[in-house]
């Protein structure tokens, strides 16, 4: 075998290795959400927010059905999605953009990992209202293929800034640094909503240790001690909270109605 063939095979093996690995992504930032929906300035007295781990739209029946997910998402103003499917050689659009277009809403797909050079998996946001800006931060350390991030979305609510943070974290036993970083970011804003799947209940020691002291669990009245999906708020009042059972996904849909603190 000639040297040129050896070099060619070596490059091919390196390429196959790089393409088959799930890679984290770099920090990104932007201004506006995507979509053709007209920019609405939110002036209402209350805002409905939700968090939903959509499990790639695969329900407990094994069927992948994005329509069932969209039916729940459309009931709220701002919805943070986790475990959203990205694009690939055979998928032109990520699931956040598909839901956004189905509902005529603004949307953003926040890539957590790349596979075969495509944004394969991530979180997402579906919103009735446009952002002032947003920024995505990768979270480390990560384990295996489970790369994580958080995205901070900056909204203006009747002239008042409100930050909405969306994330999906691994269990604290696999590393507490990502949770600490998310909670630190959450504590930087006077009015903030933290959405996501934390893979830990609110009473977990790490959650209690890192949460800002003035944090309110918007879903506390639902009486689900083992819940790992969170809507946490600061500088905001919770009017009511509700959930919808598993079925369209292996996670329930959780929502809350909030308002500014006078």
Cite the ranges covered by each PLM segment.
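Active-site regions of metal-assisted phosphoester/phosphodiester hydrolases
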Residues: 1-74, 78, 90, 101, ...
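Cell-envelope and extracellular/periplasmic
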Residues: 84
